[in-house]
Regions:
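Conserved catalytic-core segment of NTP-binding enzymes
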Residues: 241, 247-252, 257-335
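Phosphate-binding loop that captures ATP/GTP phosphates
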Residues: 164-221
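C-terminal output helix
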Residues: 107-116
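Beta-strand-loop-alpha "switch" segments that mediate conformational coupling across diverse proteins
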Residues: 313-314, 322-355, 367
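Cytosolic-facing regulatory segments adjacent to core modules
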Residues: 200-267
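Walker A/P-loop phosphate-binding motif and the immediately C-terminal alpha-helix
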Residues: 135-177, 181-185
Length: 391
């Protein structure tokens, strides 16, 4: 998968047909035509080269309105109609509305993918700005098991990342958190991710600076409790739009994803993720589950997306060695973190990253080395300061 294609369809049959004939060549973002504002904002957010619009022959005017809205929002997107039946008059109407082609579900199954590819290729050759222009990096932190404490990992990852990326703005997002908490940090932000998604309007820098607390210089926190319902259908499109808008306001976004929703997050925003960190314990069943998760990740992210393995709680005298883990995953373990349970407890209870505790730990040193290698090459080290004391 190299890019996203948007499908605007109220008819489930048309969506299923497109998923089948297009196979997995594109990431198909589906939503209904009931909210033209949502359709337009998603087209703008994705910069999708092709938009497929299902046409109901009994209500063709709705499809024509969708064509008009998309052309206004993103004139460079190429439009393709999809219909179960197609009269000559209807074909002329949608072509006048700007469609480059129209696929008929009962006839064009064998040729649909090639026709869409030709139009997508022609759109890619047009002299337009890249869809990701002006968009910051997006890093997902995931795990195959809920036993893994990705909250603690993210707490230290974002603090260390912020320390090494001087002059950059970072948004740390916990997609499944308690009220007023982001990871183990106290969060005094006025808005949650759920509320940003439900706003239905644009997110600008003024809103971010007012509503999201700056925990450290350059680091802001955002909490959420994203349920399965917000990761499906039109709600998933709203999530994509919100994440895309936030990504234009920050140099780097780090999102902790709950293991129960990893697949849904990958389907929703995987095409625009720059980096995925998979955290696992050195336990056989978790390593095997991580192997399966890595295969799923490949289906939803772009080839240039960097993928890293972090082994948390490793002990070199344990029977499961790093080489065994790497052999199973067919991938190098990029970060190895010791348990150091007492130090972890102190950091969790204090609501502070390891870097700001009195004791210096191997965990902190290894995390810093990982950041320097993978995320902060050439960056100037930031002087570490706190905006407020932990409660």
């Amino acid at each position: 998968m190299s890019e996203s294609i948007i499908c605007v369809a109220d008819d489930v049959g048309a969506r299923v047909w497109l998923e089948r004939v297009l196979e997995s060549e594109w990431n198909l973002e589906c939503l209904s035509s009931t909210d033209l504002s949502r359709v337009s904002r998603l087209v703008q957010a994705t910069g999708a080269p092709v938009v497929l619009v299902a046409i109901d022959e009994n209500d063709a005017n709705r499809a024509l309105k969708v064509f008009a809205a998309i052309q206004k929002a993103c004139p460079n997107s190429q439009l393709i109609g999809v219909a179960h039946r197609l009269s000559q008059d209807l074909l002329l109407s949608i072509m006048r509305a700007g469609a480059r082609d129209c696929l008929v579900t009962g006839v064009d199954a064998d040729t649909a993918r090639d026709r869409v590819r030709r139009i997508a290729d022609s759109a890619a050759q047009a002299p337009t700005a890249a869809p990701s222009a002006g968009r910051g990096d997006i890093t997902l932190v995931v795990s195959a098991s809920s036993i893994v404490d990705t909250r603690f990992f993210c707490q230290n990852f974002v603090a260390e990342l912020n320390e090494y990326q001087a002059g950059k703005s970072i948004l740390a997002m916990d997609s499944n958190s308690e009220a007023n908490r982001t990871f183990y940090f106290d969060n005094l932000s006025r808005l949650t991710l759920d509320e940003l998604i439900s706003r239905g309007d644009s997110i600008d820098r003024s809103l971010v600076e007012t509503a999201l607390e700056e925990y450290q210089d350059g680091l802001r926190l955002l909490s959420g409790d994203i349920s399965s319902e917000l990761l499906k259908g039109d709600a998933a499109a709203d999530l994509y739009i919100t994440i895309s808008q936030l990504a234009t306001l920050f140099d780097h976004m780090v999102i902790r994803v709950d293991p129960a929703h990893t697949g849904e997050w990958l389907r929703a925003i995987g095409a625009n993720v720059n980096r995925i960190i998979v955290v696992t314990h050195p336990v056989v069943d978790q390593v095997q589950a991580t192997e399966t998760l890595l295969q799923e990740i490949k289906e939803w992210v772009a080839p240039e997306c960097s993928r890293y393995i972090a082994v948390d709680g490793y002990h070199r005298r344990a029977s499961l060695s790093l080489s065994d883990i790497e052999k199973t995953l067919d991938q190098k373990c990029d970060l190895v973190l010791p348990m150091e349970w007492r130090f972890r407890l102190d950091a969790m209870n204090a609501g502070l990253p390891m870097a700001n505790m009195l004791h210096k730990s191997t965990y902190h040193r290894n995390m810093g080395g990982f950041i320097r290698t993978c995320c902060a090459t050439g960056e100037t080290r930031r002087k570490f300061t706190f905006k407020r004391a932990a409660v």
